[in-house]
A protein has these predicted regions:
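Intrinsically disordered, low-complexity segments
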Residues: 2-4, 35-71, 105-132
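Residues immediately within or flanking Cys/His clusters that coordinate Zn2+
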Residues: 4-6, 22-24, 69-73, 91
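Short cysteine-rich clusters marking metal-coordination/redox-active sites
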Residues: 9-12, 27-30, 76-79, 94-97
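Cys/His-rich metal-chelating microdomains
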Residues: 13-15, 33, 81-82, 100
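Short, non-ligating residues that shape and space the ligands of small metal-coordination modules
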Residues: 18-19, 36-37, 85-86, 103-104
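Charged, low-complexity helical/coil segments in non-catalytic cytosolic or luminal regions
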Residues: 111-307, 358-363
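Extended, hydrophilic extramembrane loops/domains of integral membrane proteins
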Residues: 299-328
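Final/C-terminal transmembrane alpha-helix of multipass membrane proteins
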Residues: 337-355
């Protein structure tokens, strides 16, 4: 069965219908009329659109003979995490959940990274950033401030898929201008609606999508961006003293997230060009991606995993820029005291205002 085509009014977002009396398209909600040919043009553009999705060229680098001789795989029985380290690795705890890890054998069976961004900041800087992150948090449990938890900070190379693509975009925005005035009887507000169009092409390079399921996507996106000018061809020597998370989300499985990020950025970029209005929102967008390819990279991240009353908390710091992020637990006892104090303060303030108003009436 054919799908039903629906036009939305750029003025009020209502569904436009054909008015047989005027032979025009008319919005039944705001009575705005449109010529049929105007909306027909949108149909013709949509007919000429390319498929919205494309086939990405995904990476497939292989290791040179003997290149992985000094690399070993370690696994965590608690969270399933799997990391890679060299002969010098001294870590004995999982960077994702803090539980013990065990050596499972010689590293094998994964793609060779194309690029790596070496660590720019050391463990001392990570500790300082963590202390800064904890500073001023009155509802934070005291255990989070103990030095032994800070010492669990670990340097991890996190796997990322980097996507390049061009985006051809046709977008229509609804924009408004509002003015207000008053007379002796009434206040007036007039809102004018405008339909604004933007067409163009944007190029995207190295749009990152992390390839680890053990780390929340929001956490990794929160410590972006990574400066790609520091990315260099991968060498195993950079793993010395650190561990590398072994990817468990393939490039193919990351394409959907990459497409969403590119489309969202395209809409935001074009929307920023629609200026001089009081409000702007996307009404309709047609974005086709082409020329897509992906690379495999390792990015430096300092991780701290700790627990509080059965809940695990993972903090992350960009090992290149120092950007820090992570959710904090709340001491429920301290929170209750804080709420009681706030309630008492508000009650006292309300009583004071009421007393002043009563006093003013007497005077």
């Amino acid at each position: 069965m054919a799908g039903m085509l629906e036009y939305k009014c750029p003025c009020c977002d209502g569904a436009i219908k054909f008015d047989s009396a005027t032979q025009k398209m008319k919005c039944p909600y705001c009575d705005t009329e449109f010529e049929v040919d105007t909306l027909k043009g949108y149909d013709e553009e949509l007919k000429d659109e390319k498929p919205s999705e494309m086939e990405w060229a995904t990476p497939g680098g292989s290791w040179a003979e003997g290149e992985t001789a000094g690399l070993h795989t370690y696994s965590c029985k608690s969270c399933g995490g799997e990391i890679v380290g060299d002969d010098t690795m001294a870590a004995s705890a999982c960077p994702f959940c803090g539980n013990p890890i065990v050596l499972t054998g010689q590293f094998a069976g994964a793609l060779r990274p194309d690029l790596i961004i070496p660590f720019k900041l050391d463990k001392k800087a990570a500790k300082a950033k963590l202390q800064e992150h904890l500073k001023g948090k009155t509802l934070l449990p005291r255990v989070f401030r103990s030095q032994n938890h800070i010492d669990e900070v670990k340097g991890v190379y996190v796997p990322f898929w980097l996507f390049d693509s061009d985006a051809d975009a046709q977008l229509r925005f609804t924009a408004t201008r509002t003015r207000s005035w008053s007379d002796s009887k009434y206040d007036y507000t007039e809102t004018n609606y405008y339909s604004v169009r933007r067409d163009g092409t944007l190029g995207f390079d190295a749009v990152p999508v992390d390839g680890s399921s053990k780390i929340e996507d929001d956490l990794m996106e929160s410590i972006e961006p990574f400066a790609m000018q520091d990315a260099i061809p991968f060498q195993t020597a950079y793993l010395a003293g650190y561990v590398a998370d072994k990817y468990d989300v393939t490039a193919e499985d990351s394409i959907e997230r990459a497409n969403r990020r590119i489309r969202r950025s395209t809409e935001e970029t074009f929307q920023q060009t629609v200026t001089g209005y009081d409000s702007v929102k996307v009404e309709n967008s047609s974005i086709q991606l082409h020329g897509g390819k992906a690379k495999y990279a390792l990015f430096p991240v300092w991780l701290l995993s700790t627990s509080w009353r059965g809940e695990n908390y993972l903090f992350a710091m960009n090992g290149q820029t120092g950007k820090f992020c992570g959710d904090l637990p709340v001491d429920k006892g301290a929170a209750r005291k804080w709420m009681l104090g706030l309630t008492a303060a508000l009650s006292a303030a309300s009583y004071g205002v009421m007393w002043l108003l009563w006093l003013a009436r007497i005077l």
